[in-house]
Every structure is written in structure tokens, then in C-alpha cells.
């Protein structure tokens, strides 16, 4: 069974998002082993110098990369990444399985983005959209797309 990890900066505080995440985690349990890890976000004042922004991204980046093994396939959610359609994402996940990738890690960075080291470690950079979304909401959206991909892959009704 495929192991999927979601590593994200920050805590989810909104109850409605936590409920949605729990629901999709439950639905996904029939298809994958899911692990979700929250990384503490680096405290920062509202106005930061460019050097301070890089320092924050570097510290968060170290924490993001800490638990990622060398064999894991890493997908970074990134505004500058490439977009998928849902069927294309499902096919991409199927291709990973065919290549023998049994562990896939998705990274959701902090509000300032991610460090260069995190970008270098990413095997793929995926953009959901050119729009900006709240990072806690991205976790729910990511889980829904993973669930949709699993259903498409199995030929089960869900995607319309």
C-alpha cells in the first residue's frame, strides 16, 4: 500500500478544516497509509528584511526536510510549479507506483514560501493554481485531490 506523508508548516486552528481533513483521511484509509506532520512555523514580525525572510525560510526548511528519507518521492506545493488536471494527477500517481515509488511526501511551506534547500529536494513542484490559498485550506484541498486521484485510478465513480 502506498505511503503518503503530508508535511506542512503551521497548525490548523479552524475546526471546519480539521473536520474536513479527518473525513478525507478516513476515506483515504482504504487506498493509502497516510501520515500528516505539522512543523512549527517560525515566529516573525509583520515587516521583515529580505535577509530575515530567508532566515525564516531556512529554519522552517530544516524542519520540513528533517523527517524525509532519501528514497521518498517529494512533491512540493509551489506557486511556480506545474499544474495538473485531476486525471493527469491520478496518472502521475499511477506512474510513481509503476516506477516502484512506495513513499510519496507532499510539502506545504509557510507563509513566506520555502527555502532553496526544500526546492532542491523536491522531485516535482506542483501548483494547484496561480491563486494564493490559506495554507491550512491547502491541506484539505490536497487530501481531496489525492482521494479523487485514487478513485480515478481505480475506475470508481467520484470524478465528474
Curated annotation (Swiss-Prot):
One of its GO terms (cellular component) is cytoplasm. Its EC number is 2.1.1.177. It is found in: Cytoplasm. S-adenosyl-L-methionine binds at residues 77, 109, 128-133. It comes from the Bacteria. It holds the Pfam family SPOUT_MTase. It catalyses: pseudouridine(1915) in 23S rRNA + S-adenosyl-L-methionine = N(3)-methylpseudouridine(1915) in 23S rRNA + S-adenosyl-L-homocysteine + H(+). GO terms for molecular function: rRNA (pseudouridine-N3-)-methyltransferase activity. Coiled coil: none annotated. It is an enzyme of class 2 (transferase). Keywords: Cytoplasm, Methyltransferase, rRNA processing, S-adenosyl-L-methionine, Transferase. Gene3D superfamilies: 3.40.1280.10. InterPro entries: Alpha/beta_knot_MTases (IPR029028), RlmH-like (IPR003742), tRNA_m1G_MTases_N (IPR029026). Its main location: cytoplasm. Homodimer. Belongs to the RNA methyltransferase RlmH family. Specifically methylates the pseudouridine at position 1915 (m3Psi1915) in 23S rRNA. This is Ribosomal RNA large subunit methyltransferase H. It comes from Desulfitobacterium hafniense (strain Y51). The lineage of its organism: Bacteria, Bacillati, Bacillota, Clostridia, Eubacteriales.
